[in-house]
Amino acid sequence: PNNLLDLAHKKKGVKAAVVNAGKPLPMLSVQDAVNENLIEPIFIGHEVEIQKCAEDIKWDISKYELIHVPLENDTAKIAAKLASEGKVKIIVKGHIHTDVLMKEVLKREYNLLGKTRLSHIWHMTIDKEDKPLIITDGALNVLPNVKTKMHILRNVVDFSHRIGIEKPKVA
């Protein structure tokens, strides 16, 4: 959505660990993000698959770092380690099972959790609609109690404010 791109363009692109980008959709998404100067990728995964996928879309990724890691579980470990060491600011989920990635990211040894409860936010836009639909915690906080719901609500309201929604509607 243009409003999110406008907000993002006000900031410098960030280093991003791209986990298993060796499939068309993740690679195209990363290419779009690079073209918009949103991220500088570090590709993590099977080198041959990543290179072939980039070649298939006619994108020369030779100027970006590529860490050859053949096993899915190990790609998540490398991404979490890079984030923990401050070498990347974000982790981009490519073609990797969410539970595999989250299992690593949530490990205490990486110290990636902030002081608030972690929750999942899905920002969705609908054609010809100005307002986004933001859905939270489809799978991360299953059967939350009232206290957990309050944390989730705080996270999504804070997120909404950061993307320019002054008075988000919550249901």
Where are the regions a protein language model picked out?
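Anion-binding alpha/beta catalytic cores of soluble intermediary-metabolism enzymes, centered on
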Residues: 1-171
